[in-house]
């Protein structure tokens, strides 16, 4: 039975969606005012893995991940650059899509705030009509005192602890939050019943999630720093409008990505743009590294740790490539020896360990331990030339990779004969003791991603 840690109840719970096998999941996406960084990717990859595991378990997952393309940060950034707010939003939205494609993160729906202004106005008007919101000269605000359950997600019940997002004189209470902001001179605006203006931050997610997932849904995800006030405010306005509790059944939050123990943030100047990481490392290496820690724990970034992840993944890929070669080129022998029978049984046990790990709140470190254990058996199968054990290991790895997506078979059509020729030439050079030229061929092949393994007078090669 799959168990998930629910931030709302602060405990592990059996995962029972509202309308199985359907799972409706909303994840907070980017505010597109600057480059996405590796900390953002930590959240997006984590929930992509969660989605793909749920699908592996037989659930039909609708995954909505929004794009906030109008916000104070975007307006301020446009002023800094001397361009329009839309140019800023479009530039970083396009970059975000390119990065998500590389990381193989594909939500079902990617709604943008500016495409849902009418829906947002309708949501705000409903809250005003029901007495949960009030209109002032500066905008429309949610009356937090009218909602008795405020603080249920974060556990922050003391009003003195409630944050004031911005100082506005005409609010009833300092902790009331904006649903609609009247535009100041030079700011973008849309017509509304109250004033020319734009949506507040929190109302956007409530509106878009309910539009695509309904008045009540299964999973809401995001980074831990969104718990308060963003997710707290989402709950307040959504439960006030729809009259349902809980509005979302399971709240899941990813841990911080840190640098030398400090949270990655602009204020600390330790941001690492995701595009820079992907210039140096394959997307699969980034996915592997991000999933090497449990999604709720902190993960400390360093280039050295990514290099370690690259080396680890390279070793695993080499084994997987060899297993694929054996399964494609060799044939089953029919009769198994004692080791093969035992090994195939071990693979089935390892498969169960993988599912047990992922069923325990998506414990990816333990799931990866199961994959590595299977690949150790795979290496033995390669040494023994066992087609049957190779197949058993490969089938399990392919199954696990539906979640992790790092072992995609790489196509090298037409290059094998040329590599074989170079390896043969190098062997001749070694026989002639032309070590310098032989080493030159090895180094050049290595640069091209081809690893040579000298075994006495014989040489084998693999794609790295």
From Swiss-Prot:
Motif ('KMSKS' region): 263-267
Residues binding ATP, per UniProt: 266
Cofactor: Zn(2+)
UniProt feature coiled coil, ranges: none
Known EC number: 6.1.1.16
One GO process term, biological-process aspect: cysteinyl-tRNA aminoacylation
Gene Ontology molecular function: any one: zinc ion binding
Name the UniProt record assigns to this protein: Cysteine--tRNA ligase
Taxonomic lineage: Archaea, Thermoproteota, Thermoprotei, Desulfurococcales, Desulfurococcaceae
Gene: cysS
């Amino acid at each position: 039975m799959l168990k998930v840690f629910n931030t709302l109840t602060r405990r592990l719970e059996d995962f029972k969606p509202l309308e199985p096998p359907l799972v409706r999941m909303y994840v907070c996406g980017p505010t597109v005012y600057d480059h996405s960084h590796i900390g953002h990717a930590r959240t997006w990859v984590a929930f992509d893995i969660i989605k793909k595991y749920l699908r592996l378990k037989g659930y039909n997952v609708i995954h909505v991940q929004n794009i906030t393309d109008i916000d104070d940060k975007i307006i301020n950034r446009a002023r800094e650059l001397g361009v329009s707010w839309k140019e800023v939003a479009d530039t970083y939205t396009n970059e975000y899509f390119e990065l998500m494609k590389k990381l193989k993160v594909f939500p079902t729906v990617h709604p943008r705030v500016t495409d849902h202004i009418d829906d947002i106005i309708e949501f705000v008007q409903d809250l005003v009509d029901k007495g949960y919101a009030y209109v002032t000269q500066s905008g429309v605000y949610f009356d937090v005192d009218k909602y008795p359950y405020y603080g249920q997600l974060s556990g922050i019940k003391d009003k003195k602890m409630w944050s004031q997002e911005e100082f506005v004189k005409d609010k009833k209470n300092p902790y009331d939050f904006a649903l609609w902001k009247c535009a100041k001179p030079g700011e973008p605006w849309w017509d509304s019943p109250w004033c020319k203006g734009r949506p507040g931050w929190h109302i956007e997610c409530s509106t878009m999630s309910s539009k695509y997932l309904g008045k009540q849904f299964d999973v809401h995800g995001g980074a831990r720093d969104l718990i308060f006030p963003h997710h707290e405010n989402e709950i307040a306005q959504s439960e006030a409008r729809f009259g349902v509790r809980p509005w979302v059944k399971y709240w899941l939050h990813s841990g911080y990505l840190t640098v030398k123990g400090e949270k990655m943030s602009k204020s600390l100047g330790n941001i690492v743009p995701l595009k820079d990481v992907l210039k140096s490392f394959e997307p699969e290496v980034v996915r592997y590294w991000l999933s090497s820690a449990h999604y709720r724990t902190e993960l400390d970034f360093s280039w050295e740790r990514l290099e370690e992840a690259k080396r680890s993944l390279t070793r695993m890929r080499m084994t997987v490539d060899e297993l694929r070669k054996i399964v494609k080129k060799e044939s089953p022998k029919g009769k198994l020896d004692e080791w093969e029978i035992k090994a195939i049984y071990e693979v089935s046990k390892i498969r169960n360990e993988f599912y047990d790990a992922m069923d325990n709140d998506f414990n990816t470190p333990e799931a990866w331990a199961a994959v590595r254990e299977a690949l150790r058996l795979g290496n033995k199968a390669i040494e023994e030339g066992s087609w049957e054990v190779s197949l058993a290991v490969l089938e399990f790895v392919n199954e696990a990779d539906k979640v992790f997506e790092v072992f995609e078979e790489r196509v090298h059509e037409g290059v094998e004969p040329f590599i074989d020729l170079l390896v043969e030439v190098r062997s001749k050079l070694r026989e002639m003791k032309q070590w310098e030229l032989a080493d030159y061929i090895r180094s050049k092949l290595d640069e091209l991603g081809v690893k040579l393994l000298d075994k006495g007078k014989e040489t084998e090669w693999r794609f790295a």
